[in-house]
């Protein structure tokens, strides 16, 4: 298994602030599409990044291969809708992942 940062580039920098009702529906379908991957532990985190230069989406994905990730992305409703979204993928060769159930409380961490 390999980790990738997957960046979803919207059709315009202002997308998060001014998406249409149709675009909002596509985004909801996008979230629903990835939910089984999240539940299976393949997508560790997913959500929007509010960057002053333009918002975008990010996922950290644990998958057997980049090819499989690209196949999943090709079936994402945001891509199938043909509204100008695109994915960029970056390998993460040295990843440390917290356990799902923390072994110690946050208060145990010293500054």
Question: What are the functions of these language-model segments?
Answer:
Residues 1-111:
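Conserved, structured core segments of small domains
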């Amino acid at each position: 298994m390999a980790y990738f940062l997957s960046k979803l580039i919207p059709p315009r920098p202002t997308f998060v602030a001014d998406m249409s009702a149709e675009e909002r529906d596509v985004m909801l379908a996008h979230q629903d599409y990835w939910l089984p991957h999240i539940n299976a532990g393949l997508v560790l985190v997913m959500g929007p990044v509010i960057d002053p230069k333009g918002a975008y989406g990010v996922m950290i994905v644990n998958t057997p291969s980049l090819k499989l990730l690209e196949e999943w992305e090709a079936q994402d409703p945001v891509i199938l809708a043909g509204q100008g979204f695109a994915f960029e993928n970056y390998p993460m060769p040295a990843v440390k992942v917290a356990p799902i159930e923390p072994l110690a409380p946050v208060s145990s961490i010293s500054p």
